[in-house]
């Protein structure tokens, strides 16, 4: 497999500004992610004393998996005080978008580089956001159908949308297998298809909860790298979190004030507010099989779905004795994660790192230092066919990744058309506009006639526009094969107006290139970069 790094002219300059140590952006974080001294400081930080307990919890969580020797070793390293590089993601259908796997590769790559540079073992940890309850965000994925030249949405259907956390949801296995079958129908059959289908079927048969199936697929893909997994909703982990839940409940108003103040500062720097929440407690409580947002009305803590209320002593007692009923929101999850782990760096997507920029004062309030916040690696897969099509139409890869192919497609259509025809129609449009101006001069002061002339002009311009559009549409139809090829480039490299990794699913890559494509023996060694990585299997 070939690997190269390209620099894109990104519309969103947040990550490029992190790369260049822009003082406005770096001021939002505890550490400058582009400076080596930041890593030296983090590596030398004293541990929090929770590493041995965490290692036991992670071992228990992964006990239903057959651990690799690398994972066994990393659990031992963690127990002995090794620091971690960490990141997380929701449990998407069949693994969800490719960026989930690229985030894990980011964690693997950075932890290895830190281990090699500092001669201290750094452990890669992936945090599964099983506490989330928005099932609509994880119950679907997309698949590219080569025969149709288009993307198809594949969705797991359920009679009732679960309101509990994803970790507490147990999908119907028959329906899930039907969803899997639908996905494979759209994918082309390769020498890898049958083996991949068997792996997926086995995972569905062997595991019951939504997140356990997700975990098993990740484990199948990354066990050789020694990645450790933990679900935020895992009950033994929640018991470890009880002291912090109590602190959050006791300081909830100060926490909310700190968050709002930091968010306002980011907006004062010209950034849009990323975290949208009305709560002033920033925790959820599981009650009546629903994950319910907690708020405080000045007297009581109140649940948003059942209107159940608690006085302060009651809700703190729940945190003490039943912490598994609590879960974090977008504000408190990073805080809890860093309170638990001895983290060198947190790896996040473009939106996630902007969330973290709004939390600096929250960390300071709880005397928890924000780790280095690193943008994850961004990766696109380029196959031989797409590479040949880019060459055929002389389209720069970097341009497609940023803008898609619509501009190049329109240019191609016009190149196939009669230049004289287009020029004459455009000339007629310009002539009509000049005529309209002259006519308006003739009827100046008479509003009825002005309206008449403008309406007449509008009709003529519409007719000329229609003529030109229909003519170009005919040219487009005459070049149907090329249009399909442009669409193929678009759906592969810039699907739905964004990067491939935001839409394409892991199974598509495994089906095309083999179930061992992500294994250390096959996947190219990566170096951490803020730029874009192109991998050609």
Curated annotation (Swiss-Prot):
InterPro entries the UniProt entry points to: Bacillithiol_biosynth_BshC, CC_BshC, Rossmann-like_BshC
Keywords in alphabetical order: Coiled coil, Ligase
Main enzyme class: ligase
GO molecular function: ligase activity
EC number: 6.-.-.-
This protein's record includes keyword Coiled coil: yes
Coiled coil segments of this chain: 422-450
Family annotation (HAMAP family): BshC
UniProt record similarity statement: Belongs to the BshC family.
Function of the protein: Involved in bacillithiol (BSH) biosynthesis. May catalyze the last step of the pathway, the addition of cysteine to glucosamine malate (GlcN-Mal) to generate BSH.
Name of the featured protein: Putative cysteine ligase BshC
Species of origin: Staphylococcus aureus (strain COL)
Lineage of the species this protein comes from: Bacteria, Bacillati, Bacillota, Bacilli, Bacillales
């Amino acid at each position: 497999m070939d690997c190269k790094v390209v620099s894109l002219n990104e519309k969103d300059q947040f990550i490029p500004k992190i790369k260049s140590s822009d003082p406005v952006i770096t001021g939002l974080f505890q550490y400058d992610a582009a400076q080596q001294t930041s890593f030296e400081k983090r590596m030398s930080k004293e541990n929090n004393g929770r590493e041995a307990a965490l290692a036991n919890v992670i071992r228990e969580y992964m006990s239903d998996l057959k651990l690799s020797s690398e994972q066994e070793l990393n659990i031992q390293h963690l127990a002995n005080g090794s620091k971690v590089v960490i990141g997380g993601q929701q449990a998407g259908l069949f693994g969800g978008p490719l960026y989930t796997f690229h985030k894990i590769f980011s964690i693997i790559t950075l932890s290895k580089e830190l281990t090699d540079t500092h001669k201290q073992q750094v452990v890669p940890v992936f945090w599964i956001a099983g506490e989330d309850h928005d099932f609509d965000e994880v119950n679907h994925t997309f698949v590219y159908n080569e025969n149709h030249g288009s993307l198809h949405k594949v969705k797991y259907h359920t009679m009732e949308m679960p309101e509990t956390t994803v970790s507490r949801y147990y999908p119907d296995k028959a329906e899930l297998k039907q969803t899997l079958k639908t996905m494979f129908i759209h994918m082309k059959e390769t020498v890898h298809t049958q083996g991949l289908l068997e792996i997926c079927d086995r995972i569905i048969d062997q595991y019951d909860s939504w997140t356990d199936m997700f975990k098993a697929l990740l484990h199948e893909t990354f066990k050789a790298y020694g990645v450790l997994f933990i679900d935020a909703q895992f009950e033994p982990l929640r018991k470890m979190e009880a002291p912090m839940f109590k602190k959050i409940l006791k300081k909830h108003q100060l926490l909310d004030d700190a968050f709002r103040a930091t968010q306002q500062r980011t907006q004062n720097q010209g950034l849009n507010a990323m975290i949208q929440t009305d709560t002033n407690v920033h925790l959820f409580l599981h009650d009546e099989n629903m994950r319910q947002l907690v708020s405080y009305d000045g007297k009581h803590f109140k649940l948003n779905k059942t209107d159940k209320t608690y006085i302060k002593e009651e809700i703190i007692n729940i945190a003490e004795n039943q912490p598994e009923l609590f879960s974090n929101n977008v504000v408190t999850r990073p805080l809890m994660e860093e309170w638990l782990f001895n983290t060198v760096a947190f790896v996040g997507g473009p939106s996630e790192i902007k969330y973290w920029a709004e939390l600096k004062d929250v960390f300071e309030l709880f005397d928890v230092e924000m780790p280095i916040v690193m943008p994850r690696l961004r990766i696109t897969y380029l196959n031989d066919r797409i590479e040949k099509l880019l060459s055929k139409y002389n389209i720069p890869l970097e341009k497609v990744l940023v803008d898609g192919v619509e501009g190049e497609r329109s240019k191609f259509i016009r190149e196939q058309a009669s230049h004289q025809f287009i020029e004459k129609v455009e000339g007629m449009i310009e002539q009509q506009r000049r005529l309209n101006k002259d006519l308006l001069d003739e009827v100046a002061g008479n509003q009825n006639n002005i309206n008449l002339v403008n309406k007449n002009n509008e009709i003529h311009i519409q007719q000329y526009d229609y003529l030109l559009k229909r003519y170009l549409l005919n040219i487009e139809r005459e070049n149907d094969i090329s249009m399909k090829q442009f669409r193929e480039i678009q759906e592969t490299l810039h699907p739905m107006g964004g990067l491939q990794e935001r839409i394409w699913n892991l199974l598509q890559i495994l089906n095309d290139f083999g179930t061992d494509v992500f294994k250390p023996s096959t996947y190219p060694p990566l170096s951490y970069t803020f730029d874009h990585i192109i991998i050609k299997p």
